[in-house]
From Swiss-Prot:
It is found in: Cell inner membrane. The gene is murG. Belongs to the glycosyltransferase 28 family. MurG subfamily. Its EC number is 2.4.1.227. This is UDP-N-acetylglucosamine--N-acetylmuramyl-(pentapeptide) pyrophosphoryl-undecaprenol N-acetylglucosamine transferase. It holds the Pfam family Glyco_tran_28_C. The lineage of its organism: Bacteria, Pseudomonadati, Pseudomonadota, Gammaproteobacteria, Cardiobacteriales.
Length: 363
């Protein structure tokens, strides 16, 4: 196989939305014999998840620029210069065959270092709106891959790109079809609530309030993932309102969680939307209102357009509105219809397309 023995350096960090798609590609490449390295920040989300996956992790001193004010931007040239120097030394040591940037601030210095060293650079954009790092790297990358055509808006026309969709973990792609999963299901509607790796305040605090407004017999069976920092406060809110739910900080087995659910309430990060489409589930999305260029709303549009999902704006969302939305989703057969429509937006071939693009760059 072309990837056997090849050294691949992945760059992705900051949030699960960047790290998990990159891990899906890294695992698939490792199965084909590649040696996987990862460039990131030890204190970031990737610093924990990548070593857990068994891959070699290389730390560089870099942080995001957005939200750090004037001082952060003034320090940026020095921080980036140092990070590029660190990334360059790491690449000279490990000599990767291909460098793969999948978003997050660590990708920027790494991409620049790859260009300086003339190492093939591939970038992949998961969101419907291209992020700052990938928009800059698109001018020097050998290969540009996009999850959707919408993301091409920030790429100058002279830079060719391919639309591949988003890579999703294999265990999710292997889930039975919605009809098979729903066939013998009865009892209370099963609701999966996803607060994301960073936690979503609006979802975590409004959801228990909304459920408390419903009669006991209309309340779904809830599995609520809060993110670590919102766990205790969310548990307190449920207890104070005398609403029962299974509340967890993280879900390790997302395939199982999707398989057991009838529908989902979630933010609309690119990875979440892709996983829901691939699994086949009805969804109610509450996009993060401060996402750059409102990309989370755009991420959710495909599922909304095919009738698999609804989108509610956080700024106008109340417990009453959310309670009404939950109350209107009591018909499992209607949820099954939406679940089947969701699969029209799935990216089942994305992983193979990305691996093919990596192989093309291997010398």
């Amino acid at each position: 196989m072309i990837l056997k023995g090849k050294k691949l350096l992945f760059m992705a960090g900051g949030t699960g939305g960047h790290v998990y798609p990159a891990l899906a590609v890294a695992r698939a490449a490792a199965e084909q014999g590649s040696i996987i390295h990862w460039l990131g920040n030890q204190s970031g989300f990737e610093g924990k998840k990548v070593p857990e996956a068994g891959f070699i992790f290389h730390d560089i001193a870099v942080y995001g620029l957005r939200g750090n004010g004037v001082i952060g931007w003034l320090k940026a040239p020095f921080m980036i210069g140092r990070a590029v120097f660190q990334a360059k030394k790491i690449m000279q040591h490990i000599q990767p065959d291909v460098v793969i940037g999948m978003g997050g601030f660590a990708s920027g210095p790494g991409g620049i270092a790859a260009k300086i060293l003339n190492i093939p650079l591939l970038i992949h954009e998961q969101n419907a709106v291209m992020g700052l790092t990938n928009a800059l790297l698109s001018r020097v990358a050998n290969t540009i891959l996009l999850a959707s055509q919408q993301a091409a808006a920030k790429i100058a026309l002279k830079y060719p790109y391919r639309v591949t969709g988003n890579p999703v973990r294999e265990d999710i792609t292997l889930l039975p079809a919605p009809e098979e999963r729903f066939h013998y299901r009865s009892g209370r509607i099963r609701l999966l609530v996803l607060g994301g790796s960073q936690g979503a305040k609006a979802i975590n605090l409004l959801l228990p309030q909304a459920l408390s407004l419903l009669p006991e017999e209309q309340r779904p069976q809830v599995l609520h993932q809060t993110g670590a920092r919102w766990l205790e406060k969310t548990q307190t809110e449920y207890a104070a309102l005398n609403v029962h739910a299974e509340i967890v900080p993280f879900i390790d087995d997302m395939a199982k969680a999707y398989a057991n659910a009838d529908w989902v309430i979630a933010r609309s990060g690119a990875l979440t939307v892709s996983e829901i489409a691939t699994a086949g589930l009805a969804a109610l999305f509450i996009p993060f209102p401060y996402a750059v260029d409102d990309h989370q709303t755009m991420n959710a549009q495909c599922l909304a357009e095919v009738g698999a999902a609804a989108i509610l704006e956080e700024k106008t969302l109340t417990a009453d509105i959310l309670a009404t939305a939950i109350q209107s989703r009591q018909d499992r057969s209607a949820l099954l219809t939406q679940a089947e429509r969701a699969r029209l937006c799935s990216d089942e071939k994305a992983l193979g397309e990305i691996l093919r693009a990596i192989k093309e760059l291997c010398r």
